[in-house]
Curated annotation (Swiss-Prot):
Belongs to the zyxin/ajuba family. Residues 63-78, 93-109, 174-189, 197-214 have a biased composition (Pro residues). Residues 30-141, 162-344 are annotated as: Disordered. The modification Phosphothreonine is found at T180, T265. Residues 311-322 have a biased composition (Basic and acidic residues). The modification Phosphoserine is found at S117, S144, S170, S171, S272, S300, S336. The modification N6-acetyllysine is found at K256, K263, K270. GO terms for biological process: cell-matrix adhesion; cellular response to type II interferon; integrin-mediated signaling pathway; stress fiber assembly; transforming growth factor beta receptor signaling pathway. Interacts, via the Pro-rich regions, with the EVH1 domains of ENAH, EVL and VASP. Interacts with the first LIM domain of TES. Interacts with SYNPO2. The modification Asymmetric dimethylarginine is found at R244. This is Zyxin. It is found in: Cytoplasm; Cytoplasm, Cytoskeleton; Cell junction, Focal adhesion; Nucleus. The keyword Manganese does not apply.
Length: 564
């Protein structure tokens, strides 16, 4: 039968060993395991004793102890309490089934020789590898079980390569649980006594060394169904009580398994990092089952099973993320119009225009340089490209032709001055400059021109006090010498006949005000009567001046002197 089983054996082997690995007695419980088929990879060498015992108790479904939560098998559960504990444990892939149900399973009878095929759980998960062959494969002899284990290991290897678990998890489909026929035993009922899963697993594993290799694949399968049995599948216990025949009726609890699958995936992810160490002290919790099998079993087979389960879980998460790609496509669509839109074309056109303009700008100066074939600015002879030339005053000259306009000195590499469009050396240019009327030096910088002469600004000063006259009023005397206003009045202004002071303009004024009477000059303040000192008016009225014998008098004093 090993040859026809390969496909179905993949699922069957995954489920059956998970439950019956520690003790061959629980091998018939494979029916509930198919639901957990995503956990197939562990079939190669899962923890033989511990995992198998718990798997048998919680997952097998053959015996009444399997709780409804752990096993969503169609048959009604015989033991509700045990089912509940197993269901909680089954929720997480790594945790083994509840200890109560698991303890009875470890003492599984040798009748496990009848090894049911777990294809129905694969179909429930919706994995492509799930075999359609639900009928269990009875194996009454231990030797046949060994052969079946070998076939299961090969099938599990094929399943790991194909990764059917991802498809199963992603689909989320939970086919009705089909329990393969198995031989139930009274050991399953003492599930309450098996609350402590660790001791029972250890004892059965030690008692029966040969069934342990079979239990390794069973433990992995058992952990997987536990993830699903979050839905309380009481029919699992009934399936345990029922013989192999009722396993075919498992499809009824399919809806329960469907919710279990999603729960299992998150639990597995949580458990996968520290499954073997942490959950050991908590046998009732979902995390506990994985710890017990790891401690009881050799340990080498169980880690691969967990890793395989973890790998399966990762694909599940990826499948959940797959629906997200459409928004990414929408983003790409938005970007696509922005990137390849007309804006990019316009920018390209602008760049092309700029490059063309730059090329044209560069070509024009090159053309000018090409047109350098000009004639000399002095001799009008053409200039050869290889011949050195001097560019000055906007023209080109032969080196021998670029000379001073006056002394004919070559000016190449020297400072020169331009005067009326002709080059001059520094000496000749200085000779052409005007000289200051005061110091006689050529004026090379600023020049002040006054009275028809050129001066340095600092040389144009008053001839009396030498104060600078730039920007101020000045008066020139008869010798054409500049004077400041005060010095000029002091020297040339008329003097008052009374005070003998020069008559000067008042401060802030440029005009001079004076009174002339009897051929004499007076200040306004000095024009008054000589006898009484009364100010006289410049008007011809009674307050005016009444001269008498050369004296300036008022009318009253004039009358008094005239009577005498």
């Amino acid at each position: 039968m090993a040859a026809p089983r390969p496909p179905p054996a993949i699922s069957v082997s995954v489920s059956a060993p998970a439950f019956y690995a520690p003790q061959k007695k629980f091998a018939p419980v494979v029916a509930p395991k198919p639901k957990v088929n995503p956990f197939r990879p562990g079939d190669s060498e899962p923890p033989v004793a511990a995992g198998a015992q718990r798997a048998q108790m919680g997952r097998v479904g053959e015996i009444p102890p399997p709780p409804p939560e752990d096993f969503p098998l169609p048959p009604p559960p015989l033991i509700g309490e045990g089912d509940d504990s197993e269901g909680a444990l089954g929720g997480a892939f790594p945790p083994p089934p509840p200890p109560m149900i698991e303890e009875p399973f470890p003492p599984a009878p040798l009748e496990e020789d009848i090894f049911p095929s777990p294809p129905p759980p694969l179909e429930e998960e919706g994995g492509p590898e799930a075999p359609t062959q639900l009928p269990p494969q009875p194996r009454e002899k231990v030797c046949s079980i060994d052969l079946e284990i070998d076939s299961l290991s090969s099938l599990l290897d094929d399943m790991t390569k194909n990764d059917p678990f991802k498809a199963r998890v992603s689909s989320g489909y939970v086919p009705p649980p089909v329990a393969t026929p198995f031989v139930p035993k009274p050991s399953t009922k003492p599930a309450p006594g098996g609350t402590a899963p660790l001791p029972p697993w250890k004892t059965p594993s030690s008692s029966q060394p040969p069934p342990q290799p079979q239990a390794k694949p069973q433990v992995q399968l058992h952990v997987q169904p536990q993830a699903k049995p979050h839905v309380q599948p009481q029919p699992v216990s009934s399936a345990n009580t029922q013989p192999r025949g009722p396993l075919s009726q498992a499809p009824t609890p399919a809806p329960k398994f469907a919710p279990v699958a999603p729960k299992f995936t998150p639990v597995v992810s949580k458990f996968s990092p520290g499954a073997p160490s942490g959950p050991g002290p908590q046998p009732n919790q979902k995390m506990v089952p994985p710890d017990a099998p790891s401690s009881v079993s050799t340990g080498s087979p169980q880690p691969p099973s967990f890793t395989y389960a973890q790998q399966k879980e990762k694909p599940l998460v990826q499948e959940k993320q797959h629906p997200q790609p459409p928004p990414a496509q929408n983003q790409n669509q938005v970007r696509s119009p922005g990137g390849p839109g007309p804006l990019t074309l316009k920018e390209v056109e602008e760049l092309e225009q700029l490059t063309q303009q730059l090329m044209q700008d560069m070509e024009h100066p090159q053309r000018q340089s090409v047109a350098v074939n000009e004639s000399c600015g002095k001799c009008n002879q053409p200039l050869a490209r290889a011949q050195p030339a001097v560019r000055a005053l906007g023209q080109l000259f032969h080196i021998t032709c670029f000379t001073c306009h006056q002394c004919q000195q070559q000016l190449q590499g020297q400072q020169f001055y331009s005067l009326e469009g002709a080059p001059y050396c520094e000496g000749c240019y200085t000779d052409t400059l005007e000289k200051c009327n005061t110091c006689g030096q050529p004026i090379t910088d600023r020049m002040l021109r006054a009275t028809g002469k050129a001066y340095h600004p600092q040389c144009f000063t008053c001839v009396v006090c030498a104060c600078p006259l730039e920007g101020t009023s000045f008066i020139v005397d008869q010798a054409n010498q500049p004077h400041c206003v005060p010095d000029y009045h002091k020297q040339y202004a008329p003097r008052c006949s009374v005070c003998s002071e020069p008559i000067m303009p008042e401060p802030g004024r440029d005009e001079t005000v004076r009174v002339v009477a009897l051929d004499k000059n007076f200040h306004m303040k000095c024009y008054k009567c000589e006898d009484c000192g009364k100010p006289l008016s410049i008007e011809a009225d009674d307050n005016g001046c009444f001269p008498l014998d050369g004296h300036v008098l008022c009318r009253k004093c004039h009358s008094a002197r005239a009577q005498t």
